[in-house]
Amino acid sequence: MAVGSGEMDSAIALGVEKMTETKGTDTTAALAEAADADYETIHGLSFVALNALVMQRYLFEYGWKHTDFAPFSINAHANALNNPFARLHEAITERDYIKARMIAEPINLLDASPIGDGAAAVVIVPAEKIKTNGRARRLVTIIGSASATDTIAVHDRRQITWLAAAEESARRAYSQAGVGPAEINFFELHDAFSIMSALSLEACGFAEPGQAPKLALDNEISLTGRIPICTMGGLKARGHPVGATGIYQIVEVVQQLRGEAGANQLDGARIGMAQNIGGSGSTIITHILRVK
C-alpha cells in the first residue's frame, strides 16, 4: 500500500525463520500461541490436534476416506523434486501415505508439513520505475491483495469445515483484481495440513463444499491440471519455516509468472494467487499477481 499510494518509492518484504535450535515441545508450544488460550491450548491441544478435529469432522460430513487425501501430499512431494530450495526431495506413493505414522488421528506424518529454517524476500517498486530501469525480466504486478479474520477459537465458528476468512479475503482480492477463480492459472495455498488444502480450494471457489478431494483424485491439482497448487512443493514438501512461508509463496508465484520455474514451469501462466493462513484460519491474506 505504501508503494502503491506513492508514499514510498520502494519497499522490501522479508520473511525469516529459525526453528531448528529449539526442542520440539517448545516449538509446538510457541506455535500454539496463535490458537485460543482459554479453551484450546490450556488443555494441551496443539495445531496438529486442532486440524485433526477439523479433518475428522470433514470426513464425517462429506463421506470421504482418509486415503482420499493422499493426492495432496503426493502432488506436493512430486513438485518439490525439482525445487532446489525444498526441504523434502523424495517422491511418495499412496502406499507410503497409507503406511505413514499416525500423529493425531486422522492426520498422519504425510498429512503434515515440516517446520524448519528459511528466509525469502521480495522487492516492491512502482511499475514506472521498472520500465525506466530497462530491466529485461517480465513485469509482475500485484492486482489484488486482501486480508480477513475469523474467530481464533475453532469451536466458535459457525462451521468448522469452512474457512470463512479465506472465502472473504479471496472475494475481496478477486474484486480488486477484476478476476474470478476461472481466471486464476495456479494457486499457492497454505497446505500446512492436507485438510487445509481442501478447505482453501473450496473457500476460494475452485471446488464446491466437500468436493476438493475429488479435484485432487482427478489429478486437477497437478502441474497439468485445471488448478495447479503448490507448484514448487508447498508447505508440505518445500517446508514451512513459519515466519518466511508467506514470502516464499510470493517468490514462487513470481517465478512461475516470469517463466523461471524450471522443470515445474506452467504453460502460459499469466495470473497466480497465493494465500497464507494464520492460526487455524483466524487470519488469512490473499494476493493475486499478474504478468504483463
Model-based region annotation:
Residues 154-159, 191-214, 225, 241-243, ...:
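Short glycine/threonine-rich loop-to-helix capping motif typified by GTGT followed
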Residues 29-31, 39-106:
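Glycine-rich, mobile lid/loop segments that gate access to catalytic sites or pores
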Residues 3-5, 26-36, 128-129, 203-210, ...:
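A glycine- and small-aliphatic-rich helix-loop capping segment at beta-alpha/alpha-beta transitions
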Residues 58-63, 132, 169-183:
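Phosphate/pyrophosphate-binding loops at sites that engage ATP/ADP/AMP, CoA/4′-phosphopantetheine
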Residues 1-41:
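A generic, well-ordered mixed alpha/beta core segment in the N-terminal half of proteins
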Residues 67-68, 180-185, 208-209:
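Short acidic capping loops at alpha-helix termini that bridge into adjacent secondary structure
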Residues 1-17, 49-82, 122-128, 238-261:
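Active-site-proximal alpha-helical scaffold in enzymes
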Residues 37, 41, 71, 102-168, ...:
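Condensing-enzyme catalytic core mediating Claisen C-C bond formation in acyl metabolism
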